[in-house]
Amino acid sequence: KIENVELGNYTVTETTKDIDEKNVSVTYSVNGGESQTGTSADAAVEKDETTTVAFENSYVNQTGTLQLTKTIKGDVTPEEAAGLLTFEVKTTVTENGEEVDKWVGPDGKLTDTQTKLTLEKDFTFDEETGKYTLIISNVVVGEYTITETDKDAEGNDVTVTYSINGGDSQTGDTAAAEVTNGEITKVEFENDYTKHTGTLELTKTIKGDITEEEANGALRFEITTEDGKWIGKD
């Protein structure tokens, strides 16, 4: 409250209103009148009257979008891998002076509960590109780690690589990415599966009244798997 103000017309401006990582909308009213949007209010100071200028600031967290993409290559079909692969998106925030972990759900909200995002339930598969995609909107700006927590397929070795916003490919199952205000942060993972292999050695001994040449022309072998597939020399 400012007293002894000379009579006349005044402009009242809120010059500092921004807070890091927050979006703000400012409204004002003069003498209880209709609310207006803006940071500057025009008001008249009249004799023996009190002119009231009321400002209201509404703050919301700045948010961006996190787009996760998964490509599966090698000796595992996308259908086989879909039931195996899960991800966690995690960040650290300060609450009451202490750093605590928060997880991101498919709706973009932060939760105290460890949350897993699954290829089968949360991602969408594009048959043309062969990629799984999850778009998480309304993610509060900040630093996040995206970890592929389950990736192993029985009988296979797997190599995991990732890239952020189309950058260089890195080896590993955990990517660190920054979500910025109004932008889409793209994190692409690729799993390349290779079946475990060994060596099968066959030996054949020929005895009796037959020559090696005769046996070579007559003897043949087949090797089949449990599901009836044939194995070649390679």
Which stretches of residues belong to each language-model region?
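Solvent-exposed loop/turn and edge beta-strand elements of beta-rich ligand-binding domains
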Residues: 1-234
